[in-house]
Amino acid sequence: MNQPANQFNPSSSQPVDPTVLNLTDSAAQKVRRLREEEGDSNLMLRVYVTGGGCSGFSYGFNFANELNEDDANFDNNDVTLVVDSLSYQYLQGSTVDYTEGLEGARFIVTNPNATTTCGCGSSFSI
């Protein structure tokens, strides 16, 4: 299921590819900085969905050193996003961004499949 990701530019009028997991420039820059801090330029950002949160599902992020058998990976801006097959069905066409604001610094997901999201943006329902 390895597919190249399209570069996402939030100010662009180009459509986001609905079959991949997209990454903003801001998120890619943050991942590259975190990889430098860890001293491992091969780390991949794993994005996953778990049950929980105020809307039913929650997003999670961690670093991965290797791919699992059921993983899809998407390369964008010198960063590889990894998602397992179960989470992929909920995340198709989503965009991962990184923001810094009053709520703190965090990765957020804009998910076109979500019918509702919580106010903090970390949980959703389908």
Curated annotation (Swiss-Prot):
An example Gene Ontology biological process: iron-sulfur cluster assembly
Keywords associated with the record: Iron, Iron-sulfur, Metal-binding
Names of required cofactors: iron-sulfur cluster
Keyword presence, Iron: yes
SUPFAM superfamilies referenced in this protein's UniProt entry, alphabetically: HesB-like domain
Disordered, as annotated region: 1-21
InterPro entries to which the protein is assigned, alphabetical: FeS_biogenesis, FeS_cluster_insertion, FeS_cluster_insertion_CS, FeS_cluster_insertion_RrpA, HesB-like_dom_sf
Signal found in the keyword field: no
Note on cofactor: Binds 1 iron-sulfur cluster per subunit.
Molecular function GO labels: 2 iron, 2 sulfur cluster binding; 4 iron, 4 sulfur cluster binding; iron ion binding
Binding annotation for iron-sulfur cluster: C54, C118, C120
Gene3D superfamilies in UniProt: HesB-like domain
Organism domain of life: Bacteria
Membership in a protein family: Belongs to the HesB/IscA family.
PANTHER family (alphabetical): IRON-SULFUR CLUSTER ASSEMBLY 2 HOMOLOG, MITOCHONDRIAL
Biological role stated in the UniProt entry: Required for insertion of 4Fe-4S clusters for at least IspG.
Subunit composition and interactions: Homodimer.
Name by which UniProt lists this protein: Iron-sulfur cluster insertion protein ErpA
Organism of provenance: Psychrobacter arcticus (strain DSM 17307 / VKM B-2377 / 273-4)
Organism lineage string: Bacteria, Pseudomonadati, Pseudomonadota, Gammaproteobacteria, Moraxellales
Gene: erpA
